């Protein structure tokens, strides 16, 4: 399995202090929004670095996936990490996380996603009729059948049979509910048949990507299928605030959730964003510690600050400490530049496949801009910034034994 923590440097972290250069008040919503954006973009940056490390470590891109829901900040996710799809509790945990979409098309993951979606929609129809829904223990049977390469159409028929059995003692609206359930099954069958009809072309597209020959400009069909099957991963990545990304191991039928220390409240480490101080006195001040994977976005912020004109007269009238000189900013830039050269922070630059390399670097650039924008908008990108590199007590982490 991918040894995520062994490929990352836990020897340093960053201490960051941001002081606002405006004296007008910020609402609690604005402050919450700022902190939320800092946290979200930091987490996404860590994910992109980790995806890059995984690809460079030999993980096949079709085995990387993203789920269609953000993780919920109020859930503990205490069992998140490695999920064994050969046992019922882990299957249920995976099911509740959302629908997986692979980085490149993966037939088994597509089938699992389709079954999860179909099962969920059918149970919603049953629940709407106040009928006992299908038992989630059935998910183990269905995913085991997928792992054994059984025909998905037969699995969908089984879902329909179980759903009809749930309705056998119902009289009210039974016919209408069966019709709704049958439509869900039919839609799932149609979606799968469409995938199967395109599978040969999808496989050729994947081969072209891996052989570094991929070009949509010469193939209209490629462009259509890329939109439908290849772009979804990054679309979800950008649209979700707290995406969940993982690796599927088809041989062992296991799932590994990446950056789980950001999600599992009981497994936090030195990389977790820790807000130390939020001062509401004028000027506003935010003090936090954060992992070194944020080095490049912070570097962009410092460069922006340096390029700005000197503080205007209004800001100079505030009771502030002396702003940072160019020399002091250059020192912080030098420190962050060194961290930005670390293997994990440059992992995207060494991805072997140009198609994925370009996609990930483009995502990182978008993420860097999204990190910088709110700091600038709310007046925290100024020469009052203080960033220092700190050494952690722990320098090495090992992945959990069940990996």
Residue ranges and their predicted role:
Residues 1-4, 400-402:
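C-terminal, beta-strand-rich globular interaction domains
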Residues 2-290:
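Membrane-active, amphipathic/fusogenic segments and juxtamembrane/transmembrane anchors
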Residues 114, 127, 310, 393, ...:
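Intrinsically disordered, low-complexity segments enriched in glycine/proline and serine/threonine
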Residues 288-382:
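Periodic self-assembly scaffolds
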Residues 373-403:
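Acidic, Ser/Thr/Pro-rich beta/coil linker or hinge segments at domain junctions
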């Amino acid at each position: 399995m991918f040894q995520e923590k062994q490929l990352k440097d836990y020897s340093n972290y960053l201490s960051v202090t941001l002081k606002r250069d405006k004296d007008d008040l910020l609402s609690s919503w604005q402050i919450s929004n700022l902190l939320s954006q800092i946290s979200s973009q930091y987490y996404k940056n860590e994910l992109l670095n980790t995806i890059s490390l995984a690809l460079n470590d030999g993980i096949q891109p079709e085995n990387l996936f993203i789920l269609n829901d953000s993780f919920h900040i109020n859930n503990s996710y205490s069992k998140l990490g490695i999920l064994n799809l050969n046992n019922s509790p882990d299957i249920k945990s995976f099911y509740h996380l959302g629908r997986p979409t692979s980085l490149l098309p993966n037939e088994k993951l597509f089938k699992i996603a389709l079954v999860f979606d179909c099962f969920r929609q059918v149970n919603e129809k049953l629940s709407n009729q106040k009928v006992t829904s299908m038992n989630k223990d059935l998910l183990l049977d269905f995913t085991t059948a997928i792992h054994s390469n059984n025909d998905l159409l037969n699995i969908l028929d089984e879902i329909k049979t179980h759903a009809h059995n749930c309705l056998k003692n119902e009289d009210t609206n039974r016919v209408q509910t069966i019709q709704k359930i049958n439509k869900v099954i039919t839609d799932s069958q149609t979606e799968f048949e469409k995938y199967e009809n395109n599978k040969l072309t999808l496989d050729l597209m994947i081969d072209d990507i891996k052989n570094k020959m991929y070009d949509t400009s010469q193939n209209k069909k490629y462009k259509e299928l890329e939109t439908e099957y290849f772009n979804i991963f990054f679309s979800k990545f950008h649209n979700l605030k707290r995406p969940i990304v993982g690796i599927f191991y088809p041989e062992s039928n296991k799932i590994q959730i990446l950056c789980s220390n950001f999600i599992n409240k009981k497994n936090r480490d030195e990389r977790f964003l820790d807000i130390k101080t939020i001062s509401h006195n004028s000027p506003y001040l935010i003090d936090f510690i954060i992992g070194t994977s944020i080095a490049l976005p912070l570097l962009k912020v410092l460069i922006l600050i340096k390029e700005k004109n000197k503080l205007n007269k209004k800001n100079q009238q505030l009771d502030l400490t002396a702003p940072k000189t160019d020399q002091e900013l250059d020192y912080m830039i030098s420190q962050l530049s060194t961290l930005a050269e670390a293997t994990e922070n440059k992992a995207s630059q060494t991805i072997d496949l140009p198609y994925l390399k370009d996609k990930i670097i483009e995502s990182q650039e978008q993420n860097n801009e999204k990190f910088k924008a709110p700091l600038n908008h709310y007046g925290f990108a100024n020469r009052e910034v203080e960033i220092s590199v700190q050494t952690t007590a722990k320098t090495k982490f090992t992945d959990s034994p069940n990996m």
